[in-house]
Protein backbone atom coordinates (compact mmCIF):
# COMPACT_ATOMS: atom_id res chain seq x y z
CA UNK A 1 0.00 0.00 0.00
CA UNK A 2 3.04 2.24 -0.48
CA UNK A 3 1.32 4.26 -3.21
CA UNK A 4 -1.47 5.34 -0.86
CA UNK A 5 -1.70 8.70 0.88
CA UNK A 6 -1.06 8.88 4.61
CA UNK A 7 -2.19 11.40 7.20
CA UNK A 8 0.24 13.15 9.60
CA UNK A 9 -0.99 10.78 12.32
CA UNK A 10 0.00 7.66 10.39
CA UNK A 11 3.17 6.86 12.35
CA UNK A 12 1.33 7.20 15.67
CA UNK A 13 -1.43 4.94 14.41
CA UNK A 14 1.08 2.31 13.33
CA UNK A 15 2.74 2.50 16.77
CA UNK A 16 -0.67 1.77 18.28
CA UNK A 17 -0.77 -1.40 16.16
CA UNK A 18 -3.80 -0.45 14.08
CA UNK A 19 -4.95 -2.78 11.33
CA UNK A 20 -4.73 -0.79 8.10
CA UNK A 21 -6.90 -0.64 4.99
CA UNK A 22 -7.30 1.38 1.80
CA UNK A 23 -10.00 4.03 1.78
CA UNK A 24 -10.46 6.57 -1.03
CA UNK A 25 -6.78 6.45 -1.90
CA UNK A 26 -5.61 6.69 1.72
CA UNK A 27 -3.99 4.12 4.01
CA UNK A 28 -6.21 4.31 7.06
CA UNK A 29 -6.82 2.39 10.31
CA UNK A 30 -9.81 0.07 10.06
CA UNK A 31 -9.52 -0.94 13.74
CA UNK A 32 -7.09 -0.77 16.66
CA UNK A 33 -8.52 -3.45 18.94
CA UNK A 34 -11.90 -5.15 18.63
CA UNK A 35 -14.46 -3.28 16.53
CA UNK A 36 -17.13 -3.95 19.16
CA UNK A 37 -14.98 -2.41 21.90
CA UNK A 38 -14.27 0.70 19.82
CA UNK A 39 -17.95 1.05 18.94
CA UNK A 40 -19.06 0.72 22.56
CA UNK A 41 -16.39 3.15 23.74
CA UNK A 42 -18.02 5.86 21.62
CA UNK A 43 -21.54 4.91 22.73
CA UNK A 44 -20.72 4.79 26.46
CA UNK A 45 -17.51 6.77 27.01
CA UNK A 46 -15.33 8.47 24.38
CA UNK A 47 -13.36 7.52 21.30
CA UNK A 48 -11.22 9.36 18.76
CA UNK A 49 -10.85 9.05 15.00
CA UNK A 50 -8.22 10.30 12.59
CA UNK A 51 -10.30 11.94 9.86
CA UNK A 52 -7.47 14.03 8.43
CA UNK A 53 -8.09 12.43 5.03
CA UNK A 54 -11.26 14.49 4.61
CA UNK A 55 -11.23 17.57 2.38
CA UNK A 56 -10.94 20.94 4.12
CA UNK A 57 -11.62 24.25 2.34
CA UNK A 58 -11.43 27.81 3.68
CA UNK A 59 -13.43 30.41 1.74
CA UNK A 60 -13.60 34.17 2.14
CA UNK A 61 -15.27 36.92 0.15
CA UNK A 62 -18.08 39.38 -0.25
CA UNK A 63 -21.52 37.76 -0.43
CA UNK A 64 -19.95 34.32 0.09
CA UNK A 65 -23.10 32.74 1.51
CA UNK A 66 -25.19 34.18 -1.32
CA UNK A 67 -22.82 32.56 -3.81
CA UNK A 68 -22.93 29.20 -2.02
CA UNK A 69 -26.73 29.41 -1.88
CA UNK A 70 -26.93 28.60 -5.58
CA UNK A 71 -25.02 25.34 -5.11
CA UNK A 72 -27.01 23.77 -2.26
CA UNK A 73 -30.71 23.27 -1.39
CA UNK A 74 -30.28 24.54 2.18
CA UNK A 75 -30.78 28.16 3.23
CA UNK A 76 -27.26 29.16 4.24
CA UNK A 77 -28.10 32.83 4.64
CA UNK A 78 -30.01 32.06 7.82
CA UNK A 79 -26.76 30.96 9.49
CA UNK A 80 -25.35 33.11 12.25
CA UNK A 81 -21.58 33.28 12.89
CA UNK A 82 -20.56 30.16 14.77
CA UNK A 83 -23.33 28.02 13.24
CA UNK A 84 -23.00 25.23 10.69
CA UNK A 85 -25.23 23.50 8.14
CA UNK A 86 -25.05 19.93 6.91
CA UNK A 87 -26.05 20.05 3.26
CA UNK A 88 -25.36 18.67 -0.22
CA UNK A 89 -23.87 19.97 -3.44
CA UNK A 90 -26.32 19.28 -6.27
CA UNK A 91 -25.93 18.73 -10.01
CA UNK A 92 -28.56 19.96 -12.53
CA UNK A 93 -30.42 16.64 -12.25
CA UNK A 94 -30.81 17.12 -8.51
CA UNK A 95 -28.24 14.40 -7.84
CA UNK A 96 -25.84 14.66 -4.93
CA UNK A 97 -22.29 15.62 -5.88
CA UNK A 98 -21.29 15.28 -2.23
CA UNK A 99 -22.61 15.81 1.27
CA UNK A 100 -20.73 18.54 3.11
CA UNK A 101 -20.79 20.75 6.19
CA UNK A 102 -20.59 24.53 5.82
CA UNK A 103 -19.24 26.29 8.92
CA UNK A 104 -20.07 30.01 8.78
CA UNK A 105 -17.46 32.04 10.68
CA UNK A 106 -18.81 35.55 10.27
CA UNK A 107 -17.66 38.81 8.69
CA UNK A 108 -14.13 40.23 8.69
CA UNK A 109 -13.23 43.85 9.42
CA UNK A 110 -13.17 44.45 5.67
CA UNK A 111 -16.74 43.17 5.27
CA UNK A 112 -15.94 39.76 3.81
CA UNK A 113 -17.73 36.59 4.89
CA UNK A 114 -15.69 33.55 6.00
CA UNK A 115 -16.59 29.87 6.00
CA UNK A 116 -14.92 26.49 6.29
CA UNK A 117 -16.27 23.58 4.27
CA UNK A 118 -15.52 19.95 5.12
CA UNK A 119 -16.05 17.39 2.33
CA UNK A 120 -15.54 13.66 1.83
CA UNK A 121 -12.06 12.31 1.14
CA UNK A 122 -12.99 10.55 -2.09
CA UNK A 123 -14.66 13.63 -3.56
CA UNK A 124 -12.23 16.35 -2.49
CA UNK A 125 -10.87 17.12 -5.96
CA UNK A 126 -14.29 16.73 -7.56
CA UNK A 127 -15.83 19.15 -5.06
CA UNK A 128 -12.97 21.61 -5.41
CA UNK A 129 -13.36 21.68 -9.19
CA UNK A 130 -17.13 22.11 -8.91
CA UNK A 131 -16.90 24.93 -6.38
CA UNK A 132 -14.21 26.81 -8.28
CA UNK A 133 -16.17 26.54 -11.52
CA UNK A 134 -19.28 28.08 -9.91
CA UNK A 135 -17.80 30.70 -7.58
CA UNK A 136 -16.50 34.11 -8.65
CA UNK A 137 -12.83 33.80 -7.74
CA UNK A 138 -12.42 37.53 -8.33
CA UNK A 139 -14.58 38.09 -5.25
CA UNK A 140 -13.99 34.89 -3.29
CA UNK A 141 -10.67 33.41 -2.18
CA UNK A 142 -10.56 29.62 -1.99
CA UNK A 143 -7.87 27.87 0.04
CA UNK A 144 -7.50 24.11 0.06
CA UNK A 145 -6.32 23.11 3.55
CA UNK A 146 -6.70 19.37 2.92
CA UNK A 147 -2.99 18.60 3.01
CA UNK A 148 -2.12 21.22 5.62
CA UNK A 149 -4.29 20.30 8.59
CA UNK A 150 -5.02 17.39 10.89
CA UNK A 151 -8.66 16.65 11.69
CA UNK A 152 -9.47 14.60 14.80
CA UNK A 153 -12.99 13.55 15.80
CA UNK A 154 -13.51 13.10 19.55
CA UNK A 155 -16.87 11.38 19.98
CA UNK A 156 -18.98 10.06 22.84
CA UNK A 157 -20.85 11.14 25.98
CA UNK A 158 -17.57 11.93 27.75
CA UNK A 159 -16.10 13.93 24.87
CA UNK A 160 -16.50 17.29 26.63
CA UNK A 161 -14.82 16.05 29.80
CA UNK A 162 -11.88 14.43 28.00
CA UNK A 163 -11.23 17.12 25.39
CA UNK A 164 -11.68 20.06 27.78
CA UNK A 165 -8.33 19.37 29.46
CA UNK A 166 -6.55 20.40 26.26
CA UNK A 167 -8.80 23.28 25.15
CA UNK A 168 -8.63 26.77 26.63
CA UNK A 169 -12.27 27.70 25.91
CA UNK A 170 -15.34 26.29 27.72
CA UNK A 171 -16.62 23.48 25.49
CA UNK A 172 -19.87 23.15 27.45
CA UNK A 173 -20.93 26.52 26.03
CA UNK A 174 -20.75 25.31 22.43
CA UNK A 175 -24.11 24.28 20.97
CA UNK A 176 -24.72 21.32 18.67
CA UNK A 177 -23.32 22.21 15.22
CA UNK A 178 -21.66 25.21 16.84
CA UNK A 179 -18.01 26.01 16.19
CA UNK A 180 -15.29 28.51 17.01
CA UNK A 181 -11.64 29.37 16.53
CA UNK A 182 -10.00 28.49 19.81
CA UNK A 183 -6.85 27.19 21.44
CA UNK A 184 -5.72 23.56 21.73
CA UNK A 185 -2.51 22.86 23.63
CA UNK A 186 -1.83 26.64 23.47
CA UNK A 187 -2.00 26.59 19.64
CA UNK A 188 -4.70 27.91 17.24
CA UNK A 189 -7.47 25.45 16.42
CA UNK A 190 -10.83 25.22 14.70
CA UNK A 191 -13.26 23.32 16.93
CA UNK A 192 -16.77 22.19 15.96
CA UNK A 193 -19.44 20.27 17.87
CA UNK A 194 -20.16 17.95 14.97
CA UNK A 195 -19.59 14.29 14.17
CA UNK A 196 -20.56 11.18 12.25
CA UNK A 197 -21.43 8.76 15.03
CA UNK A 198 -24.83 9.74 16.38
CA UNK A 199 -23.21 10.80 19.67
CA UNK A 200 -22.17 14.12 21.15
CA UNK A 201 -18.67 15.06 20.11
CA UNK A 202 -16.23 17.45 18.52
CA UNK A 203 -14.10 17.68 15.40
CA UNK A 204 -10.82 19.53 15.87
CA UNK A 205 -8.74 20.97 13.01
CA UNK A 206 -5.15 21.92 13.82
CA UNK A 207 -1.65 22.03 12.33
CA UNK A 208 0.01 18.59 11.97
CA UNK A 209 2.40 18.92 14.92
CA UNK A 210 -0.42 20.03 17.21
CA UNK A 211 -2.57 17.19 15.94
CA UNK A 212 0.11 14.66 16.79
CA UNK A 213 0.46 16.10 20.29
CA UNK A 214 -3.32 16.11 20.76
CA UNK A 215 -3.63 12.48 19.62
CA UNK A 216 -0.93 11.45 22.09
CA UNK A 217 -2.48 13.49 24.89
CA UNK A 218 -5.97 12.10 24.34
CA UNK A 219 -4.60 8.55 24.20
CA UNK A 220 -2.73 9.06 27.48
CA UNK A 221 -5.95 10.45 28.97
CA UNK A 222 -7.73 7.19 28.19
CA UNK A 223 -9.55 8.08 24.99
CA UNK A 224 -10.02 4.97 22.83
CA UNK A 225 -8.53 5.18 19.32
CA UNK A 226 -11.08 3.98 16.77
CA UNK A 227 -10.88 2.97 13.13
CA UNK A 228 -13.07 3.18 10.06
CA UNK A 229 -14.82 -0.06 11.00
CA UNK A 230 -16.38 1.40 14.14
CA UNK A 231 -17.02 4.69 12.35
CA UNK A 232 -19.13 2.78 9.83
CA UNK A 233 -21.16 0.76 12.36
CA UNK A 234 -21.75 3.89 14.45
CA UNK A 235 -22.94 6.01 11.53
CA UNK A 236 -25.14 3.20 10.22
CA UNK A 237 -26.89 2.76 13.58
CA UNK A 238 -27.58 6.50 13.39
CA UNK A 239 -28.79 6.06 9.76
CA UNK A 240 -26.25 8.58 8.48
CA UNK A 241 -25.59 8.32 4.75
CA UNK A 242 -22.22 7.30 3.33
CA UNK A 243 -21.38 8.99 0.06
CA UNK A 244 -20.90 6.63 -2.91
CA UNK A 245 -22.96 3.94 -1.15
CA UNK A 246 -26.19 5.45 0.17
CA UNK A 247 -26.09 8.66 -1.87
CA UNK A 248 -24.37 9.63 -5.11
CA UNK A 249 -24.71 11.70 -8.28
CA UNK A 250 -27.85 9.77 -9.25
CA UNK A 251 -29.78 10.13 -5.98
CA UNK A 252 -31.58 13.26 -4.85
CA UNK A 253 -31.82 14.41 -1.23
CA UNK A 254 -35.58 13.77 -1.27
CA UNK A 255 -35.04 10.16 -2.36
CA UNK A 256 -32.41 9.76 0.36
CA UNK A 257 -34.74 11.03 3.09
CA UNK A 258 -32.76 14.24 3.53
CA UNK A 259 -35.88 16.38 3.15
CA UNK A 260 -34.94 18.42 6.22
CA UNK A 261 -32.03 20.05 4.42
CA UNK A 262 -34.11 21.08 1.39
CA UNK A 263 -35.47 24.58 2.08
CA UNK A 264 -37.60 25.29 -0.99
CA UNK A 265 -39.80 27.87 0.74
CA UNK A 266 -37.11 30.08 2.26
CA UNK A 267 -34.59 30.54 -0.54
CA UNK A 268 -34.37 31.40 -4.21
CA UNK A 269 -33.06 29.46 -7.16
CA UNK A 270 -30.34 26.82 -6.90
CA UNK A 271 -28.91 24.12 -9.11
CA UNK A 272 -31.36 21.20 -9.30
CA UNK A 273 -34.27 23.13 -7.77
CA UNK A 274 -36.69 22.32 -10.61
CA UNK A 275 -36.10 18.60 -10.14
CA UNK A 276 -36.66 18.77 -6.37
CA UNK A 277 -39.80 20.88 -6.80
CA UNK A 278 -41.19 18.26 -9.17
CA UNK A 279 -40.31 15.42 -6.81
CA UNK A 280 -41.88 17.21 -3.87
CA UNK A 281 -45.08 17.85 -5.82
CA UNK A 282 -45.40 14.39 -7.37
CA UNK A 283 -43.61 12.32 -4.77
CA UNK A 284 -40.39 10.38 -5.26
CA UNK A 285 -40.44 7.07 -7.07
CA UNK A 286 -38.08 5.45 -4.59
CA UNK A 287 -37.04 6.01 -0.98
CA UNK A 288 -34.08 5.14 1.20
CA UNK A 289 -35.55 3.08 4.03
CA UNK A 290 -34.29 1.27 7.09
CA UNK A 291 -34.48 -2.52 7.15
CA UNK A 292 -34.22 -4.89 10.07
CA UNK A 293 -33.28 -8.43 9.15
CA UNK A 294 -34.78 -11.54 10.68
CA UNK A 295 -32.07 -13.55 12.37
CA UNK A 296 -28.41 -12.68 11.95
CA UNK A 297 -28.23 -12.56 8.16
CA UNK A 298 -26.29 -9.45 7.14
CA UNK A 299 -27.43 -7.56 4.05
CA UNK A 300 -24.50 -5.95 2.25
CA UNK A 301 -24.11 -3.20 -0.32
CA UNK A 302 -25.58 -4.20 -3.68
CA UNK A 303 -27.74 -7.08 -2.43
CA UNK A 304 -31.17 -7.26 -4.16
CA UNK A 305 -34.34 -6.39 -2.21
CA UNK A 306 -37.45 -8.39 -3.12
CA UNK A 307 -41.19 -8.08 -2.59
CA UNK A 308 -43.43 -11.05 -3.34
CA UNK A 309 -40.53 -12.74 -5.10
CA UNK A 310 -39.67 -9.87 -7.44
CA UNK A 311 -36.61 -7.62 -7.22
CA UNK A 312 -37.79 -4.13 -6.28
CA UNK A 313 -34.70 -2.44 -4.88
CA UNK A 314 -31.16 -2.68 -3.61
CA UNK A 315 -29.30 -2.55 -0.31
CA UNK A 316 -26.83 0.33 0.01
CA UNK A 317 -25.34 -0.38 3.47
CA UNK A 318 -25.73 -3.14 6.03
CA UNK A 319 -24.17 -4.51 9.20
CA UNK A 320 -24.78 -6.26 12.52
CA UNK A 321 -23.96 -3.40 14.90
CA UNK A 322 -23.08 -3.83 18.58
CA UNK A 323 -25.59 -1.44 20.15
CA UNK A 324 -28.71 -2.39 18.19
CA UNK A 325 -27.74 -6.05 18.29
CA UNK A 326 -29.77 -6.92 15.19
CA UNK A 327 -28.78 -6.94 11.53
CA UNK A 328 -29.82 -3.66 9.91
CA UNK A 329 -29.53 -2.12 6.47
CA UNK A 330 -30.35 0.88 4.34
CA UNK A 331 -31.98 0.22 0.97
CA UNK A 332 -33.76 1.97 -1.85
CA UNK A 333 -37.25 0.63 -2.52
CA UNK A 334 -40.32 1.95 -4.36
CA UNK A 335 -42.21 4.61 -2.41
CA UNK A 336 -45.22 2.30 -2.10
CA UNK A 337 -43.09 -0.22 -0.18
CA UNK A 338 -41.41 2.30 2.10
CA UNK A 339 -43.99 2.30 4.88
CA UNK A 340 -42.80 1.14 8.29
CA UNK A 341 -43.87 -2.46 8.85
CA UNK A 342 -43.73 -3.52 5.20
CA UNK A 343 -42.35 -7.08 4.87
CA UNK A 344 -39.54 -7.48 2.33
CA UNK A 345 -36.79 -9.95 1.52
CA UNK A 346 -33.09 -9.55 0.81
CA UNK A 347 -31.25 -12.04 -1.36
CA UNK A 348 -28.14 -13.09 0.57
CA UNK A 349 -25.87 -15.63 -1.14
CA UNK A 350 -28.75 -17.12 -3.10
CA UNK A 351 -31.14 -17.26 -0.15
CA UNK A 352 -34.12 -14.95 0.29
CA UNK A 353 -33.97 -13.67 3.88
CA UNK A 354 -36.84 -11.97 5.67
CA UNK A 355 -36.67 -8.25 6.45
CA UNK A 356 -39.05 -5.54 7.58
CA UNK A 357 -39.06 -1.78 7.02
CA UNK A 358 -38.36 0.02 10.30
CA UNK A 359 -38.15 3.63 11.41
CA UNK A 360 -34.83 5.47 11.09
CA UNK A 361 -32.53 6.00 12.86
CA UNK A 362 -31.99 2.51 14.20
CA UNK A 363 -30.44 4.01 17.32
CA UNK A 364 -30.94 7.39 18.97
CA UNK A 365 -28.44 8.32 21.65
CA UNK A 366 -29.76 9.29 25.08
CA UNK A 367 -26.54 11.29 25.44
CA UNK A 368 -26.99 13.40 22.30
CA UNK A 369 -26.36 17.07 23.03
UniProtKB/Swiss-Prot annotation:
Cellular compartments per GO CC: cytosol; glycine cleavage complex
InterPro entries xref list: GCS_T, GCS_T_bac, GCST_C, GCV_T_N, GcvT/YgfZ/DmdA, GcvT/YgfZ_C, TrmE/GcvT_dom1
First-level EC class: transferase
Any matching Pfam family: GCV_T_C
Gene3D superfamilies per the UniProt record, alphabetical: Aminomethyltransferase beta-barrel domains, Aminomethyltransferase fragment, Probable tRNA modification gtpase trme, domain 1
Keyword terms: Aminotransferase, Transferase
Reactions this protein catalyses: N(6)-[(R)-S(8)-aminomethyldihydrolipoyl]-L-lysyl-[protein] + (6S)-5,6,7,8-tetrahydrofolate = N(6)-[(R)-dihydrolipoyl]-L-lysyl-[protein] + (6R)-5,10-methylene-5,6,7,8-tetrahydrofolate + NH4(+)
Signal peptide: none
Gene Ontology terms: biological process: glycine decarboxylation via glycine cleavage system
E.C. no: 2.1.2.10
Record's keyword annotation contains Transmembrane: no
GO terms, molecular function: aminomethyltransferase activity; transaminase activity
Complexes and interactors: The glycine cleavage system is composed of four proteins: P, T, L and H.
Sequence similarity: Belongs to the GcvT family.
NCBIfam families xref list: gcvT, PRK00389.1
Entry function: The glycine cleavage system catalyzes the degradation of glycine.
Protein name: Aminomethyltransferase
Encoding gene (name): gcvT
Amino acid sequence: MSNLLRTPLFDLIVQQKAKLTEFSGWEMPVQFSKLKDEHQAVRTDVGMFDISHMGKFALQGTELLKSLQFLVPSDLERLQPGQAQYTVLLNPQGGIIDDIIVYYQGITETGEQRANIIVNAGTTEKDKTWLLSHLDTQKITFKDLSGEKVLIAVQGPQSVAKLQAFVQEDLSQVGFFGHFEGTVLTKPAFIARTGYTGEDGFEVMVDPEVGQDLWRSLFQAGVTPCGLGARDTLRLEAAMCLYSQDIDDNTTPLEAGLNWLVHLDSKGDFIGRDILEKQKAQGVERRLVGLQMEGRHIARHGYPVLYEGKIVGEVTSGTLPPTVGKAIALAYVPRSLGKVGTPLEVEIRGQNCQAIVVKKPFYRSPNRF
